[in-house]
Amino acid sequence: TEDPVPYAQALADNPYAGTWASGAAANTGRSEVASAGTSTANMISGGEPPITGKAEQWNGSSWTEVSDLNQSRYAVMGAGTTTAAISFGGADPGNSRIGNTETWDGSSWTEVSDLNEGRFRLGSAQSATYTAALAFGGADPGGAVASTETWNGSTWTEVGDLNAPNYQIPGGAGTNTAALKIGGANDAGSEIALVESWNGSSWTEIADLNTARDNLGGAGTQTSAL
């Protein structure tokens, strides 16, 4: 029988109904990297093992190595594009939680003002920019944190905390004024399903994920996420 709705039209009506496809491997295999950009123009930096500052760019078909971060680190977060990106937080080779922030101009990284609270395995608004970014949650030496900071292109400012401290939350979506915090782990290390919505000044708990999980991916906007 004929499908009631052609696949192409269904995909146009609901782009999240698509499928995953394999792409070319990065030049250096690693985990816990910072990511910035889109599915056809992306950039990754940092990661482990071993803990590195290596950065690579994706053009939709292949990866190319570019200039390294000044500070090697893993469990780091990022935002922006392949020509204007920001990388922040993480843990250094000595496993110290750091607040180091670096910006990318298309050819090299420059160290700028640090986060107020050094942390790793934090969250980021994936559609934010290198002049308007958001950092939330993560873990410092004392455990999971709830603190949130916004970046204005030159400095980080502490703003409203998450309702619950959690870390291992790379799953984030939206911008620095309209974002989602998705899943993660609580201070005991248990996976959680908690989702919070950010309006530019405060976080509000909303509907949970169907399956609790941490170290997940996130994409989209505050009102249409994956």
State where each predicted segment sits.
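Polar, enzyme-active/binding microenvironments
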Residues: 1-226
